[in-house]
Amino acid sequence: MELLRTVDAMQAQADAARAEGQTLALVPTLGALHEGHLALVRRALNEADHVTVSVFVNPTQFGPGEDYDDYPRDLEGDRETLEALDVDAMFAPSVEEMYPYADDEALPGPLAWVDVERLDEHLCGAYREGHFRGVTTVVTKLFHACKPDVAVFGRKDAQQYVILQRLVEDLLFDIEIVGVPTVREPDGLAQSSRNEYLDPEEREQATVLYAAVTAAEEAIEGGEQAAEGVVGAMENELAAAPDADVQYAEVVDAHTLQPVDHLVPGQEVLAAVAVFFGETRLIDNTFVQVPPAQA
């Protein structure tokens, strides 16, 4: 496996692989790799001949007061993990490499952004101003640097997954977006690099997120057609955790990410929650197909 630190080196390797007739896959990550990331890598290895994993803690997707400075970083550990999986390249650029004009005194950048509108109005986007603009901008840069045929993302970050699908469609990228189901701990908690912030009591209570989205799925599959009823089922589960500070519990259309009041048979919806335990913010969700109306 090659460790590549510059865009030029990454593009050169991608061009060489393409010249050999290989298909290319990209797995973008923030690093601090866990089993959830490795599921994405394994999927990429099945999708393409040549796999690149990017490791880059992107500053533009973190807002004021968020955990950019404290976000876990373990470049050498990530390198060893990826080498063991026979990944072809690890692309780990510096901030200066990805945002070359950030410190330009005359005209500091970036001046060019990629922004997918409307899809960031609810869920996480309503509370993390500028987050998804940072995500779509850096992913566009990674697409240009790594030149993939396939890009693999986790469906745990459901809003991001839907937004990136629309990004590729609207900007005519010849790239397939592949979504991988959420990887969970044995007790259901979605795997996340931020789980390590939790103290033992918070970690025990954090399972209410999975309980909440499971309750939403059961309510919908059981015939509940009022979004209010589904949200109520989630809130009942979240209330079992005394230290949980619920940011949102919502049901939206899975494609438009707009809120729904009444669930329509055949519609795909997304039930999602975001919860703080102290300073640690966790998310979870489930995509659910609304069943046919019962006769």
Curated annotation (Swiss-Prot):
Q: Where does ATP bind?
A: 154-157, 183, 191-194
Give the positions the UniProt entry annotates as the active site: 37 (proton donor)
Its recorded reaction(s) are: (R)-pantoate + beta-alanine + ATP = (R)-pantothenate + AMP + diphosphate + H(+)
Extra remark beyond the main annotation: The reaction proceeds by a bi uni uni bi ping pong mechanism.
Query: In which pathway is this protein known to take part?
Result: Cofactor biosynthesis; (R)-pantothenate biosynthesis; (R)-pantothenate from (R)-pantoate and beta-alanine: step 1/1
For this protein, the record's PANTHER family field holds: CYTIDYLATE KINASE/PANTOATE-BETA-ALANINE LIGASE, PANTOATE--BETA-ALANINE LIGASE
Checking HAMAP family in the record gives:
PanC (MF_00158)
Record has ATP-binding as a keyword? yes
Tell me where it resides.
Cytoplasm
User: What is this protein's function?
Assistant: Catalyzes the condensation of pantoate with beta-alanine in an ATP-dependent reaction via a pantoyl-adenylate intermediate.
Q: Which SUPFAM superfamilies match?
A: Nucleotidylyl transferase
- Gene Ontology BP terms: pantothenate biosynthetic process
Residues spanning the signal sequence? none
Q: Which GO terms describe its cellular component?
A: cytosol
Q: What is this protein called?
A: Pantothenate synthetase
Assembly, in brief, is: Homodimer.
